UniProtKB/Swiss-Prot annotation:
Organism: Oryza sativa subsp. japonica
Domain free text: The ricin B-type lectin domain binds glycan structures.
Keywords for the protein's UniProt record, in alphabetical order: Lectin
Lineage: Eukaryota, Viridiplantae, Streptophyta, Embryophyta, Tracheophyta
Protein name: Ricin B-like lectin R40C1
CDD domains listed in its UniProt record: beta-trefoil_Ricin_AtEULS3-like
Gene designation: R40C1
Triggers of expression: Induced by abscisic acid (ABA) and salt stress in roots.
Length: 348
């Protein structure tokens, strides 16, 4: 796996299995990059250029690594974590262009050197889970499928990827998603494990029609939608044998499928839980949780491994406060026997 920075533990001693050309990195997830203008085309390398091509999972030039190794310490001006996009077939990273209207470039990727010219960030959701991909150090210049909007005839085989200021075009709205069976089911290069890791849904008894999701960098509840990848979580049990809570229940992390971030303890009672980049190789109790005994109908409390008195709480999601709604914050609270504190973590 890539080494991932986390709380000063930067994992630089864990170079990627793939470096340079060739089809290495078999255990790393690879991603497809596509835009809303035509989801049947993916970003590819062709003759040294970055273009769109008809989606083909067997074309390794359409497979990209999303390298998050610098994400903990390098952010854009909005606080979004930096990543590099490294082509599986060539080992080259997508590099900033000369400016607006110019095609993005390709450059050799040095995993030991934080070169800002190959670092990108994703914006907030700009509709249906699409996001802008923009320069780390100039978030006003975004990936743009050149003339890929309807007014210019749409995307075609060979459409160039350039940078352009935000014009609200479908050709500027992107998703970076894992390839299918050949990729880890998770959505980030700092995912907990290789292989097809099953994802889980997290919901509370107050309203089982809502599931825990990531939105705008926060953990909240949203109407349940299996197609919304942000509602998919990996329950990583890798430390469960060695770390238990005071009642003996095993510890786990909850890692978002899309962002690769783990839910982190809040600052205290009443504060929202947080998200941080997940480093599977580093034992960090601040991202570890346990489940209580059954508190009725198979529901359980989800609580801090090192303070089981603070539980997941759908803030003001009890009947007295109007119930769960779209956007209800997940905070920590002492046990009050509320339905908004009783949770299930079940497979999708």
């Amino acid at each position: 796996m890539f080494g991932f920075g986390h709380h000063g533990h930067h994992g630089q001693d864990q170079p990627p299995q793939h470096h340079g050309g060739g089809g290495g990195g078999a255990h790393q997830p690879t991603f497809k990059i596509f835009c809303r203008a035509d989801e049947g085309y993916c970003v590819a390398v062709r003759e040294g250029n970055v273009v769109l091509a008809p989606t083909n999972p067997r074309d390794e030039h359409q497979h990209w690594y999303k390298d998050m190794r610098f994400s903990a310490k390098i952010k854009d001006e909005e606080g979004n974590p930096a990543f590099a996009l490294v082509n599986k077939a060539t080992g080259l990273a997508i590099k900033h262009s000369l400016g607006q209207g110019h095609p993005v470039k390709l450059a050799p990727f040095n995993p030991e050197y934080p070169d800002e010219s190959v670092l990108w960030t994703e914006s907030g959701d700009v509709g249906k889970s699409f996001r802008c991909i923009r320069m780390l150090n100039n978030i006003r210049l975004n990936f743009d499928a050149f003339h890929g909007d309807k007014d210019h005839g749409g995307v075609h085989d060979g459409t160039t990827i350039v940078l352009w200021e935000w014009a609200k075009g479908d050709n500027q709205c992107w998703k970076i998603l894992p390839w299918g069976d050949e990729a880890y089911a998770g959505g980030s290069a700092n995912a907990p494990r290789g292989g097809n890791e099953p994802t889980v849904r997290i919901f509370c008894k107050a309203d089982e029609g809502f599931s825990v999701t990531v939105r705008g960098g926060s953990v909240c509840l949203a109407p349940t939608n299996p197609r919304d990848e942000y509602q998919h979580w990996i329950k990583d049990m890798r430390h469960s044998n060695s770390i238990k809570d005071e009642e003996g229940y095993p510890a786990f992390a909850l890692v978002n499928r899309v962002t690769g971030e783990a839910i982190k303890h809040s600052q205290g009672e009443g504060h929202p839980v947080k998200l941080v980049p997940y480093n599977p190789g580093y034992q960090d109790e601040s991202v570890l949780w346990t489940e209580s005994r059954d508190v009725g109908h198979g529901f359980r409390c989800i609580r801090m491994v090192n303070n089981i008195y603070l539980n997941f709480d759908a803030l003001h999601g009890d009947k007295d406060h109007g119930g769960v709604r779209d956007g209800t914050t997940v905070a920590l609270w002492k046990w009050c026997e509320g339905d908004n504190q009783r949770w299930k973590i079940v497979p999708w």
